[in-house]
A protein has these predicted regions:
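Glycine/proline-rich, positively charged
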Residues: 35, 75-128
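A structural signal for isolated positions on well-ordered beta-strands in alpha/beta enzyme cores
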Residues: 65-67, 97
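P-loop/Walker A phosphate-binding loop and immediately adjacent motor/lid segment at beta-alpha junctions
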Residues: 61, 70, 125
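Hydrophobic positions in alpha-helices of CheY-like receiver
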Residues: 57, 70, 117-120
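Residues at secondary-structure transition points
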Residues: 24, 28, 48, 65, ...
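N-terminal binding-site loop/beta-alpha segment at the start of enzyme catalytic domains
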Residues: 1-64, 122
Length: 128
């Protein structure tokens, strides 16, 4: 597996990740992917697969770089915080490695969203 640095974080992630959009396979195929080196797992609030990902990474969390996303309809400050808390509950974890905006929402100032994202980092709920 080839790795690349995630921006200027010093963190190296696999070039190939396991995407979970429309994923229906349960934890075992994801676990096999992790065994084979595909340790970047991408999920999202919208995919409704965070619980399956959580089951797959249980006991393997130290091997996985976990990325998930917040819906564009949840970009107000309080909604971002609630969405991240829900994702963590579904993932059965205490930190998201990379929390991303799934798509923008022109009705919400980006400064409001980014302030909430920074708060998640400050609280230790999100790394990047």
């Amino acid at each position: 597996m080839e790795y690349r640095e995630l921006g200027d974080t010093g963190v190296r992630v696999p070039e190939i990740g396991l995407g979970t959009w429309k994923y229906k396979g349960g934890p075992e195929p994801l676990r096999k992917g992790i065994e084979l080196g595909a340790t970047l797992i991408d999920t999202a609030e919208m995919y409704k697969t965070e619980d399956a990902v959580g089951a797959a990474i249980k006991g393997r969390r130290d091997k996985v770089f976990l990325a998930t996303k917040v819906l564009g309809s949840n970009l107000r400050r309080d909604a971002v915080l609630r969405a991240a808390e829900k994702s963590l509950r579904l993932l059965d974890d205490n930190v998201i490695d990379l929390y991303q905006i799934h798509w923008s929402n022109r009705s919400v100032p980006i400064a409001e969203t980014m302030s909430a994202m920074e708060e998640l980092v400050d609280r230790g709920m999100v790394r990047y």
